[in-house]
Each structure stands twice: as structure tokens, then as C-alpha cells.
Amino acid sequence: MAKYKKKRARELQHDRFRDTTIGFFDRLGNLLEGRGRTILYGLGGLILAGLLVMFFVKWSNRKSDEAEQALGRAITISKGSVLAAPVAGSTEPSFSSEQERAQTAIAEFEKVAAKYGDPYKSESLYFIAANRLVLDRQKGIGELTALTNSRVAEVAALSKFALAQANESDNKLDEAAQLYAALAKQNSPTVTAETANLRLAKVYAKQGKKKEAADLLFNIVDASRKAKGSDNQPLPVSAAAREAGEELQKLDPDRYAQLPPETPSLAG
């Protein structure tokens, strides 16, 4: 009986909304007879359009949340540990080999790419290509190369950086240097000039270009130590700048000694 009353209450509430809405349009129609009917239809269309926009925004937000969660699950898999045997009681994903992890991750990213639009689709394609390097290196490099032209700026930058790292790993140092230099010039929020120049300096060092490498490393650290915020206070030294300092100290101690001192409170 209680269920019936609740159901009936919902029906009555719905009927009141319907009657009120229809009654409003009826009264408005009486006031706008003749040519006013066109205005009425126009108003009805505007209200309908507004409702559709509201519905789309809510649906889009739900889809975005859903897509982010799906992408997050796939990323968690791709970061899973490679262990000889699973840890008892652990809920974190683990795999017996890098190949198994890559295959599982690719399958999960493919689901995201098939179900959602950009940026989630392009981001998934990037992760697929990056994981593919473990299974089929040449195919993965081909996919990353294609993604360097992605319309999603973050994906284009990440793909170019991953491609540069692959070339560096394969000892294709000239190709890697070109990509790192291009990324440094772009200075995107995803791959900053500081990060790209740090990698470029390491490539120069491998190529025996000690001066070029030292110049880049010096400039990274020098700029970081001199950087100030809007309050004119020194900014914390970035991880890339700290690593650049360590590399410079090993590569050219004399040049390292020429750097301005680091702010004591930020030396950490």
C-alpha cells in the first residue's frame, strides 16, 4: 500500500508539471492568436533547445567522468609491477613480464579509444603506442610518429618526447637531438623547455659535444636559481634543474662552480 501511495504521488507530481506546462502554453497561445502562434512556436523551440543543451551538458559531464575513470584504470594497469609471483593480499595489478603488462594495458586502452572521443581517444592511442614498444618496437615507433601530428597538443608533445627517448635508446642520437630541440623550442606545458633541454644536453654529452651540453645544463640551472615569483621571492628549484646541476657538476666541475649560489632556504 505504501509503495502504491509513493507511486501515485509521483504520478500526481508529474501530472501537475505537465498540466502547468501545457496550461502555460495554452494561455500564452490565447494571448498570441494569429501571427502570435509563430512566436509561440519560436518560444517553445527556444525552451526545448535550452532543455537539450542542459541535457547535453549533464550527459557530457557524466561521459567525461566515465572516460577519465576508464583511462585511469588503464593507466594503473600500465604502471603495474612486474613480479615473479603476485604479492599475497595485494589489490594492485602485477604481471609476470613486461610483455604481459603491455598486452593487458593495450587491450584496456583500446576499449577507451573505441568508446570515447578526444581527448581520451588520442590519449589512449598514445599509451597504446608507448606500450607497443615492448611488443613490436617498429610498429610502436610508427604509431608514435603519426601521433606527433595529433590535434590534441598534449598528445603531440608526449608522442614526440617518447619518440625522442626511443631514438636515444636505439642510439639514433641525431634524430633524438632534433626532436628534443623542437620540443624545447615549443616549450609546451606538457613537455617544458627545461625538461627537453635536459634530455638534449644528455644526448650532446653522449655525442661528445661537451661544451654544448655544459652550456645547456648551465643555462637550465642558472635560470632556475634566478627565477622569482610574483612576490619577488625566489622560486623552488625544479627537479629538472636539480638534475641538470648534478649532470653539470659531473661533466664540467669548473663550469658548475660559476653558477650563482642556490638560495639556502630552497636548497633542500
Report the location of each language-model feature.
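Acidic, polar-rich low-complexity tracts and alpha-helical solenoid repeat scaffolds
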Residues: M1-G268
